[in-house]
Every structure is written in C-alpha cells, then in structure tokens.
C-alpha cells in the first residue's frame, strides 16, 4: 500500500467497485443453471422472502429504480417464474407474485449461498462480521456526514 493518499489502491471506492464487480461475476456460473442473472436473482430473493409485492415495494427493497426493475420482472415473467397483475382497487399498482415454477426454483437456489461462500474462500463463521461491516458501510453511505468548512475550503482553494 502506497503512502500517496491518491494512489488508486488506497481508494475505498475503487476496492469496493472491484469487489462488487468480481463477486457479481463469480455468481454468473452459479446462477446460469438456474436461468437467472444476478439482478434477477436479487428480485427472486426478495419475492421468496415475501410475495406478492408491488413493483414499488420490490424497487424499495432492492434499492433500484422502478424503471430498472420492470425489465427484470418482464424477463422473469417470460421465463414463467412470476406473474404481474394490476392490484384490485388500484389499477396503477402492479403486484408481482411467484408462480409455482418460481416457488419451485427456490429449492435449487437454496444451494447458491453456500456455493458462493466456498467459491469466495470464505467461512460461514466469517459472515456475521462481514455482514455487520457491509451494513455499516451502507448506512454510512446512505447518510454521509456533511462536509466540514475545512474540508470544503481544502477542496475549493488552490494550493
């Protein structure tokens, strides 16, 4: 690790981006036999936890824009894993529910977490601490501390 504060290897954002890209890539061969992409897998995980859900509820749960969720749901519908239906009494709300095929897919997908833990060289005992760290980072990113006057000055003043 370099002493240079601007060295690429020292940047948290760079390390997180590489880790995210690498982990998502490692999921590809695991999810392929299930006929799912990683984003589709996330939608299915949310629906296996609770179904039906509205498009908005799924969007909120996954922290994705509804416009990003819609094509994923349409593809899952074409694959026969989910159905989309207008909510009774509210034509503007679309409910997403699992089909029997989507429910059955869970029996195969249940192996994914342990496979991924092994593929990434982790131990199940490592997961609680890793999850705590990730949840802490997510919470910090959701509510970053405001810039101080000194930080603002350092960023705007020529040196």
Model feature map: region roles:
Residues 24, 74-132, 142:
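Charged, amphipathic alpha-helical coiled-coil/dimerization segments
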Residues 1-34, 128, 149, 153-155, ...:
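N-terminal leader segment of winged-helix/HTH proteins
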Residues 20, 62, 66, 106, ...:
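Short amphipathic alpha-helical/adjacent loop interface patches that line ligand
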């Amino acid at each position: 690790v370099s002493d240079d504060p601007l060295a690429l290897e020292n940047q948290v954002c760079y390390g997180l981006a590489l880790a995210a890209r690498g982990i998502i890539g490692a999921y590809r061969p695991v999810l392929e036999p299930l006929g799912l992409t990683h984003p589709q897998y996330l939608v299915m995980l949310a629906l296996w936890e609770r179904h039906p859900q509205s498009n908005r509820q799924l969007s909120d749960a996954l922290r994705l824009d509804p416009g990003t969720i819609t094509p994923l749901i349409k593809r899952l519908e074409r694959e026969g894993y989910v159905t989309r239906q207008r909510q009774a009494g509210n034509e503007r709300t679309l409910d997403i529910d699992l089909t029997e095929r989507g429910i059955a897919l869970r029996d195969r997908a249940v192996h994914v977490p342990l496979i991924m833990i092994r593929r990434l060289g982790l131990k199940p005992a490592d997961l609680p601490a890793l999850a705590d760290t990730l949840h802490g980072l997510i919470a910090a990113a959701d509510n970053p501390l405001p810039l101080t006057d000194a930080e603002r000055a350092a960023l705007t003043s020529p040196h």
